[in-house]
């Protein structure tokens, strides 16, 4: 059995004033309020979303 790798991210900047697609990406990653933390599976799709809005996030 293989264990799934996970990545933990935290929203550190507000998505107010950003593109609508960036705000949708924040919601897609399961983040709502500032400093909220989400733990997701480490997949290429999630990595791409993190890369798209990296200026709003901190990877823990």
Curated annotation (Swiss-Prot):
Record GO cellular component, one term: cytosolic large ribosomal subunit
Keyword Ribonucleoprotein on entry: yes
InterPro entries reported in the protein's UniProt record: Ribo_uL30_ferredoxin-like_sf, Ribosomal_uL30_bac-type, Ribosomal_uL30_ferredoxin-like
Record bears the keyword Ribosomal protein: yes
Any one of the GO BP annotations: translation
Top-rank taxon: Bacteria
Keywords: Ribonucleoprotein, Ribosomal protein
GO molecular function: structural constituent of ribosome
Quaternary context: Part of the 50S ribosomal subunit.
Family: Belongs to the universal ribosomal protein uL30 family.
Protein known as: Large ribosomal subunit protein uL30
Source organism: Verminephrobacter eiseniae (strain EF01-2)
């Amino acid at each position: 059995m293989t264990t799934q790798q996970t990545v933990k991210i935290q929203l550190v900047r507000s998505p107010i004033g950003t593109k609508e697609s960036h705000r949708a990406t924040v919601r897609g990653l399961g983040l709502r309020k500032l400093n909220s933390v989400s733990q997701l599976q480490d997949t290429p799709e999630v990595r791409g979303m993190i890369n798209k809005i990296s200026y709003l996030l901190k990877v823990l």
